[in-house]
């Protein structure tokens, strides 16, 4: 079997597979071809891949010589013409947002494996790319907010006086949100967390966060741990609660997403305008429409 690893386009720094994982496949008898410069932004040089046992080629030769092709993001629509019938593409496809791309891939006779719709089950845990990336996103979101904030997360006491700890509001207590809670608390901030799922309340508390909620949220045990669409009445109550807490917060980190749908708008324009001068908003749902209006 021949596996090809594509170089990502644009500002994407990730690569589908690092040299260490390539070496494992090589030992199993798999042939691996890596596109030139694929790992450059992930600090993996072409020589590192060669040392792992892979070969390095340009995109055209890689595609023509591979049966199974890996990438973080799917290749652009205008490049699908270089792929052949019977090939398999494995990527983070976001099927709900990329129906046109999927249709063109189908017409080319390609098999597409969407890593982002693997169910969140114990059996599939080792392939759960969304949770892995969400952990990193939650961590980096707090560090980015702390860097941008013209203040400090922890409380400082000195001869000149006392500086109160920053208040951080986290919207969504999924993997990214819970990671953000943990890091913000470790940095000394006071953390409040909003989520429509009451089941995450104890997890938030165990990390040192204060859980805030609106009564009447709709939940679905079959949703695999994800949030579900709420009623209009609930959304109005939700917006009132979020505005009340956001106005008093120094940092708001938004992580709420619904699989296969546009992210819910939780932070309205008037909420942003009512927030304190110098406060920071980090919207991790921006790629699916954003939680911030």
Model-inferred region functions:
Residues 6-44, 154-245:
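Glycine-rich phosphate/diphosphate-binding loop of Rossmann-like nucleotide-binding domains
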Residues 8, 36-39, 61, 74-75, ...:
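Short, ordered loop/turn segments at secondary-structure junctions
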Residues 1-104, 108:
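An N-terminal-biased, well-structured beta-alpha scaffold segment characteristic
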Residues 96-122, 261-293:
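Rossmann-fold NAD(P)-binding glycine/threonine-rich loop
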Residues 32, 56, 89, 111-113, ...:
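Hydrophobic beta-strand scaffold residues
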Residues 53-67, 74-75, 222-252, 256-273:
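A structured beta-alpha segment of the ubiquitous adenosine-cofactor-binding alpha/beta core
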Residues 22, 46, 80, 102, ...:
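Generic hydrophobic/aromatic pocket-lining and core-packing "Φ" positions
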Residues 2, 77-167:
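Glycine/serine-rich phosphate-binding loop and adjoining beta1-alpha1 elements at the start
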